[in-house]
């Protein structure tokens, strides 16, 4: 017979179980009157990891089109009033903006991991931008 690795187990001890008080035993044997089932909850981090996998697979735009369009028009108004945009121009701006943000967050995550953390912080974004040469 082959040897198998022994694992530590909790010992049961040699003592016999003590008698429970009558009220405790009655409470345990009586069925729960409420019968309200708790909603299922995933462990912390499980849903986050699922979302990460989902969004890494997908290619669709994550910022809604109309709010992004309003933002572009608001920023453009500071430079020249009554500017008009082709819908393809707004789409190109949105593609470029989202690609930039995803790339920045990837670098930010690497900076947080380098600092032995899993949570990104503003200082990680500053470091990532500084290393890219965007901001001094």
Swiss-Prot record:
The modification N6-methyllysine is found at residues 5, 10, 15, 19, 24, 28, 37, 80. SMART domains: H3. It holds the Pfam family Histone. GO terms for molecular function: DNA binding; protein heterodimerization activity; structural constituent of chromatin. Phosphorylated to form H3S10ph. H3S10ph promotes subsequent H3K14ac formation and is required for transcriptional activation through TBP recruitment to the promoters. Keywords: Acetylation, Chromosome, DNA-binding, Methylation, Nucleosome core, Nucleus, Phosphoprotein. Residues 1-45 are annotated as: Disordered. The modification Phosphoserine is found at residue 11. InterPro entries: Histone-fold, Histone_H2A/H2B/H3, Histone_H3/CENP-A. The modification N6-acetyllysine is found at residues 10, 15, 19, 24, 28, 37, 57, 65. The modification N6,N6-dimethyllysine is found at residues 5, 15, 28, 37, 80. The modification N6,N6,N6-trimethyllysine is found at residues 5, 28, 37, 80. GO terms for cellular component: nucleosome; nucleus. Belongs to the histone H3 family. Core component of nucleosome. Nucleosomes wrap and compact DNA into chromatin, limiting DNA accessibility to the cellular machineries which require DNA as a template. Histones thereby play a central role in transcription regulation, DNA repair, DNA replication and chromosomal stability. DNA accessibility is regulated via a complex set of post-translational modifications of histones, also called histone code, and nucleosome remodeling. The nucleosome is a histone octamer containing two molecules each of H2A, H2B, H3 and H4 assembled in one H3-H4 heterotetramer and two H2A-H2B heterodimers. The octamer wraps approximately 147 bp of DNA. This is Histone H3. It comes from Mortierella alpina.
């Amino acid at each position: 017979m082959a040897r198998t690795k022994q694992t530590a187990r909790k010992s049961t001890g040699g003592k016999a179980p003590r008698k429970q008080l009558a009220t405790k035993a009655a409470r345990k044997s009586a069925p729960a009157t409420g019968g309200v089932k708790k909603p299922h909850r995933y462990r912390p981090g499980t849903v986050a990891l699922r979302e990460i996998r989902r969004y890494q697979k997908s290619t669709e735009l994550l910022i809604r089109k109309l709010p992004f369009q309003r933002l572009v028009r608001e920023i453009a108004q500071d430079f020249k009033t009554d500017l008009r945009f082709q819908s393809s121009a707004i789409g190109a701006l949105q593609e470029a903006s989202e690609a930039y943000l995803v790339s920045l967050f990837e670098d930010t995550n690497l900076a947080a991991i380098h600092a032995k953390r899993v949570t990104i912080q503003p200082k990680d974004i500053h470091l990532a931008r500084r290393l890219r040469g965007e901001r001094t």
